[in-house]
Amino acid sequence: MRVFWDTNLFIYLWEDSPAGARMNALLAWQEEQNAEVVTSTLTLGELLVRPMQRQRADLVAQYSAAFAQMHLIEFDRAAAFRFAQLRSTHATLAAPDAAQLACASTAGVDLFVTNDRRLSRLQIAGVGLIRALAEAAALP
C-alpha cells in the first residue's frame, strides 16, 4: 500500500502540533498495513522555506536527510499534464493542491492524506482514496 502525505502532515509530525494524536494514529495504522509513505518533491520545497528564512541550516539538513530515505515523486511531464487536467476541471483547486494530486495520480497511490477536508470530496484517477487526517487516522 502506498500512502501519499500532503505537506501539512510532515509539519504536524515534526513540530509540536495539536494534531499529534491523529498523526500517531495514522502512523500506527500505516505500520499495521505495512504502508509506504510517499510524497512529492514539492513537499520538500515547501518544508524547506521556513528553515531557510530563519537560516536554520540544522533543520534544512535534518529535513533533507529525512527525505533522502523516502520515495519522492517528481513533478514531471506526465504530472504537468495531469495538473492541467485537474485545474481545468476543478476551477477552485489551488495550484499547490493540484500539483500534489497530479504527482499522486501519475505515481498511483492507494491513499492521499491531507488536512484539507475539501480535497477529500474529490475523486482523482490514480488515487484510491483522498482523506483528511482526522478521517485517515480512523481507517479500519
Where are the predicted features?
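A generic structural signal for short hydrophobic patches within well-formed alpha-helices
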Residues: 10, 44, 80, 119-120
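Short beta-strand scaffold positions
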Residues: 38-39, 74, 95, 114
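Acidic catalytic patch
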Residues: 69-90
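Short, well-ordered secondary-structure micro-motifs
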Residues: 50-52, 124-125
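Conserved glycosyltransferase catalytic-site signature
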Residues: 7, 41, 97-101
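Short, well-structured N-terminal submotif of metal-dependent ribonuclease cores
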Residues: 1-39, 51-62, 117, 131-140
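Acidic, PIN/NYN-like endoribonuclease modules and their adjacent C-terminal/linker elements
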Residues: 2, 72, 101-140
